[in-house]
Amino acid sequence: MFCLTLTLAAHGWGAGKLTAPELIALAKAHGPELRAGIEATFDAKDLKEGTAWAGQGPEFFFAVEAATAPTLVVDEQPGLPMEALPGSQLWFGIAYVMPVGRLHQFHYVVNGADFGGRLDMPAFGPLSYLQPGVPGGKLSEKLIHTSKIYDGMKSEYWIYVPAQYDPATPVAVMVFQDGGGYIDRTGNNPVLNAVDNLIAQKKIPVMICVFINPGDIADAPGTPTYKAVKGHADRWGRTLKDAMRSTLYDTVSDRYVRFLRDEVLAEVGAKYNLRKDGYSHAITGASSGGICSFNAAWQMPNEFSRVLSLIGSFTSIQWKEDPAVAEGGQDYPDKILREPKRNLRVWLQDGANDMENPRWGSWPLANIRMANALKTRDYDFHFSFGKGTHNGGQGAAEFPEEMVWLWRDYDAAKTAQEYVPDPTEKGKPFFRVSSLNRDEQ
């Protein structure tokens, strides 16, 4: 879609903001600094709308502005009374939310009516926090690549090298689309912590991670790529940068995976000893980055054989935008059914409250179609379908589990493996819409 937004009402980091443990400690002590801490940490809009929260592990802090006493409801469990802050209309509460590594929801009940809340509240597990004694890897400075395949497009990217990397031994590689959203250890998607922990526990192989942002074509006016992207932007009222991202990620062709293979990974491989086999290459992204990752592996399964697609945009965003490309993302379920089977391992994630777009289609139904097509053809796949929106929270909370599943049974002595369905998936039924969110007629 347009961009990946990981929406947390409070990050707890930055000037004046408090972490969830700090807020919880103040709340338990009934310290006089609590009100100032709440007002510094949360936006006034989130407090008024009942969408403010902060969490670490299973411990969560909630704050809301209300004229009368609100009750907090988490995952439809019995309500928790909130405590008033004297001299204000602010209320606060603490909740212990389980299980971790999962997405949760909350809302309030005020005067008998539901109010505020969010459907996307991830509870991160221990593996999303760097564990004691685990060595952290090194993130490069921001690098810039100028593309030939995309006529001078400039892309920002970062290289992450784990502490266990030995230049004498070639290592696996994983490429992250919208990469800048994954490089903050204390952010909404603490991938670096999980990678370090999982490598240390030998649950995934030693790997170099490449975090790449969508490119910018603004400095290459007059080129064929610029003209095509500018045309898409003008037709649909999108910015040039957003249209470039969609052109890269949503187009059903081999152009982007050639860009990764021939330019980006070639550049990274000149500095680090990367394995060349697709068995040792994984790719991931969210939203348009999700379909991008699947498309890259579909086009070149010998380059990428492991796919992690989060809230993937298997919809018609780039359909018929390029006259030379006949298909759109909405065609992938049928392509899976009708075309020769690829040797891929695929984790899909989406939420029941993902988008319904009048131009491009339904994200939840598209992902369900993808899952059923993969199951029909006996692909090695997993579909994690929750209740979330078009938001990265569920994928971020489940990331350690996703990685362990994606890299399970990896053997560095091999360069290939025929993927077969996970035994836990093999006997399960197809996905069905068994209930509707409306009264029966």
Q: Model-flagged regions — what are they?
A:
Residues M1-A9:
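Bacterial N-terminal signal peptides
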Residues A10-G14:
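Boundary at the C-terminal end of the N-terminal hydrophobic targeting segment
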